[in-house]
Amino acid sequence: MAVNLSRNGPALQEAYVRVVTEKSPTDWALFTYEGNSNDIRVAGTGEGGLEELVEELNSGKVMYAFCRVKDPNSGLPKFVLINWTGEGVNDVRKGACANHVSTMANFLKGAHVTINARAEEDVEPECIMEKVAKASGANYSFHKESSCFQDVGPQAPVGSVYQKTNAVSEIKRVGKDNFWAKAEKEEENRRLEEKRRAEEEKQRLEEERRERELQEAARREQRYQEQHRSAGPPSPSSRTGELEQEVVSRSRQEWESAGQQAPHPREIFKQKERAMSTTSVSSSQPGKLRSPFLQKQFTQPEASYGREPTSPVSRPAAGVCEELAPSTPPSAQTDDEPTYEVPSEQETLYEEPPPVQQPGAGSGHIDNYMQSQDLSGQGLCARALYDYQAADDTEISFDPENLITGIEVIDEGWWRGYGPDGHFGMFPANYVELIE
C-alpha cells in the first residue's frame, strides 16, 4: 500500500522547509509512521546536528531523517537523507515500507547523500561526514580562498633545456640496443633451425616407413612364393584359371549368339534362387524318382566330357548358369540305369557316356586335377586371401584363410559357393585363390 503524506501534509512541509532554510536554527527533522498505518507524521526536530539526531532514532520503528550539515571541504551546506529501519522491525513491515523509500525521497528533495541504515554503526557522525566529504568532489575551502592579487615579484629567467651529450652513456645505450637486436636475431635463427630439423626428422621417418613397407612387401611376396613352391608346381592353377576364363567367355558367347545381353552375376544368382524355390516335384513313373540335382549333373553335352571336365553349360533360354560340377570317373558311370530321371520339362535321361578319348598331355593334367576334386567331395575349392563382408543376403562373408567349397564360376569377376558358415552365395573372385 502507498505511503500517505496528505493527512499530516502541512506539518510535514513545515518541518522540511525549516531544515532547508539556511538561516533557520533547525538543522534536522525526523519522520515516522502513525502506529501500523502508512500515514507519515513528524517525530521531532532539533538544532543539535547529527549527534542529537542519532539519539532520537528508535530501533523498533521505520523512520526517515533529513539533516543539514556543513561540507568539511568547501564549508557549504549539504543535506543528508537517512532511511532508518530498526533491527526490531518485523520482516512483513520491512517489506511494506521498502516501497515507500522512493516516495519519501521525492518529498524530501535536495539530498546530497542518502544513507540506508539498520544499526547505530551506520549513522555515526564521523562516517556520515566522511561520505559527505567524498560526495562534494572538491578539496578546497570556499571561505578561505582570497580574491586579492598578490605580487610575488619578478620571476627568474627560464633555464635552457639543453643537456650535454655524455659519450659514455650514449655508447652504453647504443650497445644495449645492439645487444637486444642481436638476441632477437639469434632467437629467430634458432627457431628457423628447429623448424628445419623438424622437417628433416619428418622426412627421415617417412623414408624409414617406406623402406619398412617395401621390406614387408618383399617378405610377403617371398612367403607367398615359398608356399606355392611347397604346394607344388603352379601349372595346374594357371591352367585352371585359363579354363575359368574359357568357361566365362563361352557363357557370354552363348548369350550373344542367342541375341541377349549377358546378365550381371547378381541377377543370375537371384534368378536361379527363384527358379529353385518355385520348382516342385512332379509326378514320376513307378519305381523312378525325378531329381533336379541329377538334371544339373547328367544333362551335360557328351562332347564336354572329352574337352572340358570342369566346364559349366550356360543355358540362355532358362536365364541362369548351370553349376560347375566335377566330372564323374568312368568307373563310377558303368553302373546300371539310375533310378532318377530329370523333370518333365527336360526329358533327357542320363545315359552312360561314350568312352572318353585319350586326351593330350595338357588335358591329362586337367583330368587328374578334376578327379582329385571329385575324390574330395567338395567340388571346386578356394582359400580366402582377404576378408570380405556380404553386402546383402545373396553374398557370403569370409575371413582370410577360410575355405570356400562348391564354387561355381558364373562370371569373370564374381563366383559363388559355400562359405565357412554353410551359406551359399556370391563373392568376388579376386579375393580368393584356388586350391590345387
Curated annotation (Swiss-Prot):
The modification Phosphothreonine is found at residues 26, 299. The keyword rRNA-binding does not apply. Residues 185-229, 264-275 have a biased composition (Basic and acidic residues). Residues 185-371 are annotated as: Disordered. The modification N6-acetyllysine is found at residues 176, 296. The record marks 367-368 as: Cleavage. Residues 276-286 have a biased composition (Polar residues). The modification Phosphoserine is found at residues 160, 277, 280, 283, 291, 311. GO terms for cellular component: anchoring junction; cell cortex; clathrin-coated vesicle membrane; cortical actin cytoskeleton; cytoplasm; cytosol; dendrite; early endosome. GO terms for biological process: adaptive immune response; endocytosis; neuron projection morphogenesis; podosome assembly; positive regulation of axon extension; positive regulation of dendritic spine morphogenesis; postsynaptic actin cytoskeleton organization; Rac protein signal transduction. Keywords: Acetylation, Actin-binding, Adaptive immunity, Cell junction, Cell membrane, Cell projection, Coiled coil, Cytoplasm, Cytoplasmic vesicle, Cytoskeleton, Endocytosis, Endosome, Golgi apparatus, Immunity, Membrane, Phosphoprotein, SH3 domain, Synapse, Transport. It is a peripheral membrane protein. It is found in: Cytoplasm, Cytoskeleton; Cell projection, Lamellipodium; Cell projection, Ruffle; Cytoplasm, Cell cortex. Detected in brain (at protein level). Widely expressed in brain with highest levels in hippocampus and cerebral cortex. Located primarily in dendrites and, in moderate amounts, in cell bodies. Isoform 1 and isoform 3 are the predominant isoforms in brain. Residues 178-232 form a coiled coil. GO terms for molecular function: actin binding; actin filament binding; protein domain specific binding; structural constituent of postsynaptic actin cytoskeleton. It holds the Pfam family SH3_9. Residues 377-436 form the SH3 domain. The modification Phosphotyrosine is found at residues 340, 350. Residues 2-133 form the ADF-H domain. Adapter protein that binds F-actin and DNM1, and thereby plays a role in receptor-mediated endocytosis. Required for the formation of organized podosome rosettes. May act as a common effector of antigen receptor-signaling pathways in leukocytes. Acts as a key component of the immunological synapse that regulates T-cell activation by bridging TCRs and the actin cytoskeleton to gene activation and endocytic processes. PANTHER family: CORTACTIN AND DREBRIN, DREBRIN-LIKE PROTEIN. Interacts with FGD1, MAP4K1 and PRAM1. Interacts with ANKRD54. Interacts with WASL and WIPF1. Interacts with SHANK2 and SHANK3. Interacts with both COBL and PACSIN1. Interacts with DNM1 and SYN1. The SH3 domain mediates interaction with SHANK2, SHANK3 and PRAM1. Belongs to the ABP1 family. This is Drebrin-like protein. It comes from Rattus norvegicus (Rat).
